[in-house]
Regions:
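Phosphate-handling DNA/RNA-contact segment within nucleic-acid enzymes
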Residues: 4-85, 98-99
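Acidic, metal-coordinating catalytic cores used for nucleic-acid/nucleotide bond scission
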Residues: 49, 70, 89-99, 117, ...
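Flexible glycine/proline-rich, aromatic-decorated loop/lid segments
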Residues: 75-78, 104-106, 145
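Short, hinge-like loop/turn segments at secondary-structure boundaries
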Residues: 81-82, 103-105, 131-137
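Conserved acidic, small-residue-rich alpha-beta core segments centered on
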Residues: 86, 98-109
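C-terminal or mid-to-C-terminal helical accessory/interaction module adjacent to the motor/catalytic core
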Residues: 112-183
Length: 183
């Protein structure tokens, strides 16, 4: 069970205690529905309300990771159940950091991963309410690869007018591509 703080204070979601019957790290919210639709692609969102909102608008392959901390057990569940995982976490700092952590887990499990980058809203719920499911699906179809996402995040964190940052950027990109570093 979970409740959501309506004033967007931190933490947004407050979960009931875990016990031998329920452990949120082993489950994905709405996973049973997504599986029923036999989708080869699952859109993983951060919050329960994101998943509920997407389902209400006909996007039945959305699941929520029950917070920002994707676990290895959740990753294995996804790996066994679909061909592609599209991460659509919130655009805030916590959501972006969680995206990076989740990417690492899913990459290590051998998942085909894409990252949803919506514009004009803070999360999938707000976006689909504001712009509709067709436009949301347009962004899903344009979800970017893991390498592309990491390169974009790296660009944001460095000053590419600075020579040292430029070298750091190139070395990191080369590392991501599995090549040798530049001197």
């Amino acid at each position: 069970m979970c409740i959501r703080d309506r004033d967007d204070s931190k933490p947004k979601y407050i979960n009931s205690p875990e016990d031998i019957v329920y452990s949120k790290g082993r489950h994905l919210f709405a996973f049973n529905i997504a599986r029923k639709y036999n989708s080869k692609t699952i859109i993983m969102v951060e919050g329960y309300m994101d998943a509920v909102s997407l389902h209400q608008r006909g996007i039945h392959n959305a699941v929520a990771s029950l917070g920002t901390a994707l676990t290895e057990a959740q990753g294995r569940l996804l790996r066994r159940s679909c061909e592609k995982v599209i991460i659509g976490y919130d655009a805030d700092g916590a959501g972006q950091a969680a995206t990076l952590r989740g990417l690492e887990i899913l990459q290590n499990l051998g998942c085909d991963i894409r990252i949803l980058q919506i514009e004009g809203a803070k999360d999938p719920d707000e976006f689909v309410v504001k712009y509709g499911p067709e436009r949301f699906q347009m962004y899903v179809n344009k979800a970017i690869s893991l390498v592309e996402f990491k390169v974009k995040m790296l660009k944001k964190s460095l000053d590419l007018d600075n020579v040292n940052d430029k070298i750091k950027f190139l070395n990191e990109v080369i590392s991501q591509l599995g090549l040798q570093n530049v001197e």
